[in-house]
């Protein structure tokens, strides 16, 4: 807690953004806001408790969802969901995750599975490209490309008639 309070007092910082798995967010959200955190990125790969547990190995979906709702109530400037879609694991949840983001006025970014760790693991068997995600999104939502630019391999789209932006972070297929 004191680390965040100390960082929040640094006047040279334009903004403080935190990326988290969300498991402790319900109890820490107000302290983080008070410390000056303005934006939060929360990992959420599934809305199904068993799939969530499988993907995170120990994660409790309800704790993360409660944390997200507490963060909304606390009033952070921006809350974004980060999601990795994987074939035959959670790829069928694409629309559910986007609809969740729309319902709660959140942004959502899809991050391609990155080739890290065990090099013997065949990521091609589970990896869902952001090109495929974009095609699927266009089947259901009206998207317009934004002029948001980052230093990384990301594209951002606004979903028409919503407050939600979708990010496609493609470190694998577009790098």
Question: In which residue ranges do the predicted regions lie?
Answer:
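Radical SAM/AdoMet-radical enzyme domain recognition
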Residues: 1-111
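Functionally engaged cysteine thiol sites
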Residues: 17, 115, 175
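Generic structural motif
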Residues: 47, 88, 113, 162, ...
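Electropositive, surface-exposed helix/loop patches at the edges of structured domains
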Residues: 64, 83, 116-118, 151
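Aromatic-anchored, glycine/proline-accented short structural segments
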Residues: 98-128, 132
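Accessory C-terminal segments flanking Radical SAM cores
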Residues: 118-175
